């Protein structure tokens, strides 16, 4: 059995407080939702972060600016 859905959706404003790695944001009807996972190094980091010296320690995680 096939169902055909025609939709017209108008969104004047939308606010999303947070998106996590397991979030699903859907507008309208989805016949199926397929899993997709992407890992991106958006900070330009080239090596692991150094270990913390004390619990609750605040450290800078700015990527190095050296060019290679």
Swiss-Prot record:
Induction: Expression is sigma K-dependent and negatively regulated by GerE. Transmembrane segments: none annotated. Keywords: Germination, Sporulation. The keyword Calcium does not apply. One of its GO terms (biological process) is sporulation resulting in formation of a cellular spore. InterPro entries: GerPB. It comes from the Bacteria. Required for the formation of functionally normal spores. Could be involved in the establishment of normal spore coat structure and/or permeability, which allows the access of germinants to their receptor. This is Probable spore germination protein GerPB. The gene is gerPB.
């Amino acid at each position: 059995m096939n169902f055909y859905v025609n939709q017209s959706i108008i969104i004047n404003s939308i606010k999303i407080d947070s998106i996590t790695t397991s979030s699903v944001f859907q507008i309208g009807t989805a016949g199926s939702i397929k899993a997709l996972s992407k890992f991106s190094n958006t900070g330009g980091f080239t090596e692991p972060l150094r270990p913390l010296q004390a619990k609750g320690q605040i450290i800078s995680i700015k990527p190095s600016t050296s060019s290679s």
